[in-house]
């Protein structure tokens, strides 16, 4: 509760059902490259479409969520991606209905409130999503929800083992 999480459902939800199960739901709307930063922009949605990954926030944490009056869409299993581009970078938010280990140099897993670079062998849980970027290897991946920046996770790169100054407060 209170955190953004990723979900990809195998059935549609109407706006009334969305309001019943989730406090807020956001979809990937655009991507932009700004220097060494890659900005992902998410905005409001009313209905949820089967096979599309969304950021969701629940009002309260539950261990099991039961959906009523829904129909599984078998065709959604093979689709399930949102693709946006600004010309310099293309972002593909891929949904999955089973555990997967995505392959590629520019794959990002979602943790509550942030995307972070997926290490080789990272497993993505069922009914979630992961991000693939083409055209750029950003230093930072910034997540914007309704125009406001959320958590920032530095992307591991060539400077990962560089010497840095560390300061303490004592």
Which stretches of residues belong to each language-model region?
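Short linear interaction motifs
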Residues: 34-42
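Intrinsic disorder/low-complexity signal
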Residues: 36, 72-74, 85, 145, ...
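C-terminal outer-membrane/trafficking sorting elements
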Residues: 23-32, 149-170
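A short, polar beta-strand/turn micro-motif
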Residues: 1-21, 41-151
């Amino acid at each position: 509760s209170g955190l953004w999480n990723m979900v990809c459902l195998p059935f549609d939800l109407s706006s009334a059902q969305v309001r019943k199960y989730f406090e807020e739901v956001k979809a990937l709307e655009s991507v932009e490259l700004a220097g060494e930063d890659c900005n992902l922009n998410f905005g409001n949605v009313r209905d949820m479409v089967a096979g599309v990954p969304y950021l969701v926030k629940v009002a309260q944490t539950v261990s099991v969520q039961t959906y009523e009056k829904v129909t599984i869409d078998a065709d959604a299993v093979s689709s399930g991606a949102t693709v946006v581009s600004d010309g310099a970078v293309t972002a593909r938010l891929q949904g999955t209905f089973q555990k997967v280990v995505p392959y590629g140099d520019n794959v990002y897993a979602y943790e509550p409130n942030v995307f972070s670079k997926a290490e080789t062998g990272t497993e993505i849980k069922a009914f979630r999503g992961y991000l693939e970027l083409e055209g750029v290897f950003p230093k930072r991946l910034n997540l914007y929800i309704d125009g406001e920046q959320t958590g920032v996770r530095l992307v591991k790169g060539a400077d990962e083992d560089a010497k840095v100054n560390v300061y303490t407060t004592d």
